[in-house]
């Protein structure tokens, strides 16, 4: 899932963030990676969330429960299948 914030969404993002984090936690082991995109000032301007899902429809249904989406935070939301080719992630 790739999401880009609508303009001037910082306050809404901060207000809804605790519920968004609870939502991410509720995804359990299906959640592989999540975090914000940042602008030059270090402010959040979007998000990426990668989950393991049995289908694209199941993934969309899960993401539609995200409080960020329910709050209308994003200008653009894109759900796409993804395949790991190289993984050098470090926590």
Indicate where each model-derived feature is located.
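Conserved, structured core segments of small domains
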Residues: 1-91
